[in-house]
């Protein structure tokens, strides 16, 4: 545990991640819950009990007893059954030891001062914690067992304690505890953290952006863990056609259950995807459960993506390993299906980079080849196509994507056109255009939905043969 990325590997993320919300939901580390707001003692008393009607295991709490650290206050807290740990945390006395050992010292002093104190008259169940602190070691062991085999550097600890216990503890501590006494939840979290650090000294407890989130139910002693995903940024080249960017569920069974005959039980319309060609080697290397793929746009299944590649962020879920060298991962990915997909520029990143990649709109360069019947003179074709350079297109939502795109007219600029080549009935050219341009429709017009188009300027029906993304102009 703790064999993780160095501090230089990842910069601290200040936004774009929702883990910090736990800090306001009583799931922070000890530092996040040590701040005790001033309380009106009279209001606190009136909230939940009615003076002398409150009893604790037959031992009436004397609400008129002085608060700690007065000797009579400490003696009274002992009489009502405070355990050594709670005695120390609300006693307000400095000792050489803390926790149970510190409380035992205070108890010993109190018994030496007051011979009337008797262990036999003291309740066995602590009214301040219901003996929760006896389970600290057990809880720490459960956390370690649950996370066995998982490498992590930081942890966020969340504690759930029954409301009625918190209320009763707060009333007793507010009335009889020393000023500034730490509340139960803070002290319980601190005790668990101290025990964890005693067993695993190379981890840090944090209030936000942890590698691992742990929640403890104080009622059942149940421990739940949530391993935070890791994110890796890079660019991919798709060298073969017929591969979707992400997993495509089977059209017949929608990927439900064990699939169907149509997908041969895979649940997928296409057996391969850029997501899995890249993600499977990473998932296996990090011993993770699954991946999610976030690309800067996407190309059609029959379109290649060349040049420096398309930026993407791969999200790796529930990784047991978090410190793999990106260069090593890059090598594993590129040896997986080198004739189909390659990656470059891999580096670890943060969750905020997902939205940055998905929201970035970059100009793109393409090369497209199409076929026409009865072509006009070559010079006329070249001049007509070059004449579209700088034009702003009006593109209605294409028929082929109308099921997943809003019906509206989009304006997109053709930045430049170059390298027009005419080879009998086949024509090829390169262009650079605004993000979101439907390039195939620029050529064949989609039955007039794109204006102007190559079809309209050469007055011939156009059949697109292939399209390649040559470059995505993103920093």
What are these regions, as identified by a protein language model?
Residues 1-4:
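Short, Lys/Arg-enriched N-terminal segments with co-localized hydrophobic residues
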Residues 6-475:
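Non-catalytic RNA-recognition surface used by pseudouridine synthases
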